């Protein structure tokens, strides 16, 4: 008997199914991709018991010719490619010809399809055709998959609960809807509609369906292009983050992919705007020449190889930075959720079945503007239509405050409110560039060397002028302008100022140094000594020059004049620890970490009471920062309470 044997098709398909058909969500993904490749404009997906019992997919695509239906369930039979050249210019989602035979080998399948002239129906069990007959000529395909893994019980026992499997299917459908907003998707689980999109091509509307209306409202459009790539999509403002990367969706030529470097590029675009351990929400759609991407890496087609990956990552990061720089990123306080009424649900035009007249609500005043002569604030703004229904996963986020009816009557602002705030601070404005008294410099200087204020300082995205009126608990500055009240975290504010100051100094060639009367002596461990010896050039690039002074001992005889005073030794030690944690850290990354660390040490601390002119100087310097809205660790610097919200809190408007 021969030792090496040719496996039969049934066994080969089961082996292939181990990679292609992981769980019910894998089947939904493959079959929906087939429907998309068939130029469908409407796709219905119905599952029962998380897809374990039944999966039904109906589309209105081109269908399959009756005489080719049986061939479609053969291994490596496909209409997508014909030659080797086609393999490197793939423009479809499917191309391997493995999905249908793999699915059929581990389940019972019933498919009915037609190109519009004649229809055919076929039934399979365990990959074998058991029945075949003509059917109606409705153009499109209906496929029903039941009893998944009925003939491979070992695979069945490794599946999770019904709710978990249904969640995976929902994730697949959400990605498909985001990738193809021009297709009308209808996803039903156990008889309940989970997702239903309009298919009108409005990506923001689909985001509202998937992530919720409030999330969609905080999404910022993004565009970018180069000779090889075209980028468009939406990113959430930094105030809206998640605990993992699952909310970053990257699509290349309509295909959802996972790529660590591109995900990292998204995070780099939010540089210092995200809190540690938090991740942004992003929906990015990339278009490129198919020759620049290799999708033939894994049967699941989630992993791809990219040409010019570094250039693409840089373009993504820069496009995100540009989009965020054009937005006002001052977060507003979170509103309490209250019970919503049916009329309030309908007042926001999320429905595409029901399109009510656009209501006028108050203008969200985030940009500086002059008040009218009669001192009234126009708070009307057309609400944006961005979706219709919501899934159970985010239904709780859809709460709307009671009392906000359409066309609410908003009285003029009380005359006692000071309107010309700038007059009060004319003298303080003239003192902006003056230094603080010496005793304050010793304690924790509030004022930094003035950062250059760009020509676009008053453009969209720039921080508006703020006028301090007091301080709370020696920690928060209370300020105002025509748009309302602001709370500023004074430590975070100066941390941002110091960070940009140190970051600028670290990037410059080493300038003046300060000789120390008493050199700093560092006693290190053997491991630390080895790391310092290997990374001496990196330390010198950030202004730290170490001389050997015996076994495992180094001395520092000078340091740059801009080093944080009084914290020189601890600063140098922390730089050594960073090298110890990451020996491969680049000079740029070390400069970045050093700037963050030094800014935190040098910034003014809480419980530090400031005079009004000191607060004014701090706020003016903050305005000159390139990124004034977050500290280097991503925490917010400023919280905005609009005049409308304050009046609403005091029941002056309803």
From Swiss-Prot:
<comment type="similarity">
    <text>Belongs to the DNA mismatch repair MutL/HexB family.</text>
</comment>
<dbReference type="InterPro" id="IPR002099">
    <property type="entry name" value="MutL/Mlh/PMS"/>
</dbReference>
<dbReference type="GO" id="GO:0140664">
    <property type="term" value="F:ATP-dependent DNA damage sensor activity"/>
</dbReference>
<dbReference type="InterPro" id="IPR037198">
    <property type="entry name" value="MutL_C_sf"/>
</dbReference>
<dbReference type="GO" id="GO:0016887">
    <property type="term" value="F:ATP hydrolysis activity"/>
</dbReference>
<dbReference type="InterPro" id="IPR014790">
    <property type="entry name" value="MutL_C"/>
</dbReference>
<dbReference type="GO" id="GO:0005524">
    <property type="term" value="F:ATP binding"/>
</dbReference>
<dbReference type="Pfam" id="PF01119">
    <property type="entry name" value="DNA_mis_repair"/>
</dbReference>
<dbReference type="InterPro" id="IPR013507">
    <property type="entry name" value="DNA_mismatch_S5_2-like"/>
</dbReference>
<feature type="compositionally biased region" description="Basic and acidic residues">
    <location>
        <begin position="413"/>
        <end position="434"/>
    </location>
</feature>
<protein>
    <recommendedName>
        <fullName>DNA mismatch repair protein MutL</fullName>
    </recommendedName>
</protein>
<dbReference type="GO" id="GO:0030983">
    <property type="term" value="F:mismatched DNA binding"/>
</dbReference>
<dbReference type="InterPro" id="IPR014762">
    <property type="entry name" value="DNA_mismatch_repair_CS"/>
</dbReference>
<comment type="function">
    <text>This protein is involved in the repair of mismatches in DNA. It is required for dam-dependent methyl-directed DNA mismatch repair. May act as a 'molecular matchmaker', a protein that promotes the formation of a stable complex between two or more DNA-binding proteins in an ATP-dependent manner without itself being part of a final effector complex.</text>
</comment>
<dbReference type="InterPro" id="IPR036890">
    <property type="entry name" value="HATPase_C_sf"/>
</dbReference>
<dbReference type="InterPro" id="IPR020568">
    <property type="entry name" value="Ribosomal_Su5_D2-typ_SF"/>
</dbReference>
<dbReference type="InterPro" id="IPR014721">
    <property type="entry name" value="Ribsml_uS5_D2-typ_fold_subgr"/>
</dbReference>
<feature type="compositionally biased region" description="Polar residues">
    <location>
        <begin position="384"/>
        <end position="394"/>
    </location>
</feature>
<dbReference type="InterPro" id="IPR020667">
    <property type="entry name" value="DNA_mismatch_repair_MutL"/>
</dbReference>
<dbReference type="InterPro" id="IPR042121">
    <property type="entry name" value="MutL_C_regsub"/>
</dbReference>
<dbReference type="Pfam" id="PF13589">
    <property type="entry name" value="HATPase_c_3"/>
</dbReference>
<dbReference type="GO" id="GO:0006298">
    <property type="term" value="P:mismatch repair"/>
</dbReference>
<keyword id="KW-0234">DNA repair</keyword>
<dbReference type="Pfam" id="PF08676">
    <property type="entry name" value="MutL_C"/>
</dbReference>
<keyword id="KW-0227">DNA damage</keyword>
<dbReference type="GO" id="GO:0032300">
    <property type="term" value="C:mismatch repair complex"/>
</dbReference>
<feature type="region of interest" description="Disordered">
    <location>
        <begin position="358"/>
        <end position="437"/>
    </location>
</feature>
<dbReference type="InterPro" id="IPR042120">
    <property type="entry name" value="MutL_C_dimsub"/>
</dbReference>
<dbReference type="InterPro" id="IPR038973">
    <property type="entry name" value="MutL/Mlh/Pms-like"/>
</dbReference>
